[in-house]
From Swiss-Prot:
Residues 1-19 form the signal peptide. It is a single-pass membrane protein. It comes from Caenorhabditis elegans. The chain crosses the membrane at residues 177-199. This is Uncharacterized protein F46C5.2. The keyword Membrane applies. It is found in: Membrane. Keywords: Membrane, Signal, Transmembrane, Transmembrane helix. It comes from the Eukaryota. One of its GO terms (cellular component) is membrane.
Amino acid sequence: MRRKNGFSVASVFILCSIAQMTCEEFELENTESLVECVQCVQLWRSASAKEGKVCTSGATTCKGNACFMRQCKHCPVYQYMSGCVNFSPWQLADLEMNRRTSELRMRRVGAVLLCEDTFNQTTCVCNRRDKCNDIHSRLPFATYAEGLFRGVVNFDTIIAAIDPRYLEVMSGYHFRFLASSSSSFSSFLPSIAIILFFVLSH
């Protein structure tokens, strides 16, 4: 019996090691209680301190069962956005499942911010304290690769409800980004053809 119990403990330890974060505590509290969140939109340029949406210390707030924050890396207008989100129990369950299967990039001890990092932005959610999405706070975080929030929540729609210009600006940016990438690749094709011709002819 002791041998069997010892084997079970060893099996759990091995499974935890293989799955990395599977046995770590989930960063979000699975609760329906509300938290107060900072709600604002910060522009790269021309952001007026008189606007209530600007992310200053006196920014407006909202309430949800979680807060979110998004930092843009290369957006044409937007720098930072934050607000509230209301996760249903199934969304929280799906998010925890995505977390277990996503690539972990960085984790701080006692992480309370759950973040996804992509080529253009970093998005985080939290709900363990009021205003946990305040840009001026420095809370421990866990960051995962792209795919963490896929199929769970659409932050673009939530941000558009705060600032209706967001979707129009970002859709234009993505179109220009894809077009420039395509043209760059097309201009590179003749060089590839010349190299291949040179290699095959020798």
